[in-house]
C-alpha cells in the first residue's frame, strides 16, 4: 500500500495519459468540524471511478453525479478551476453527512495536464518533496522541488499544496499487534518497515512486510 496522495495522483496521471476526462478535487478550506483535513485530494474520472476522498462519502457521491451528467443544470463542466462549497446551511450539512457546524470548500481542477502529472508522480517516486501551485483563474500549474513541506496556502488567485515522501516507521517484531499498528500507520501516510527473522510471521500479513 502506498501513500494515499501518491496513489491518487498516479491514477489521475494514468487516466489523463489515456485521454480520459478527469478532475482533481482538493480540500482548500474548512470551517468547524470536517471529515477530511485541508489538503486532502480525490481524483474523479468521467467513467465515475474515484480514488481518494474529500469527505465521508456523500460529497463524493454528489461530485460523481454532477460530473457524470453534464446536461443537468448544476453539472460540473470542464473549464477553468472552480471553487465549490458544501455545508453552508444546516440542511445541506445534514444532507451531505457533514459534522455539526461543518463546512468545507473544494478546488476542482478539470483535466489536469498529463505530462505535468507524470512528472509530479516521478518526483514523488524518487522521494522528493514537491510544491504544486494552481492559478484559479487560468488553471496553469507550477511545480517545483522543495526542501521542506509547507501547509496548503489559499491566497488570492493561487492555491499551493505540498506533496512528498512519507514519514518512515520501523517496527521490530512481526507479531499480531505490529500488523495492526502497521496497517493503521499505512492509512496515516507512513512507509512501514518491519524487521523480524521469523519468516513464518510474514506469511499472512495483509500489507507489505520486510523481514531481516
Give residue spans per PLM region:
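Segments forming oxygen-rich coordination pockets for charged ligands
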Residues: 1-208
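Short acidic-hydrophobic, aromatic-tinged amphipathic segments that line or gate anion-handling sites
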Residues: 212
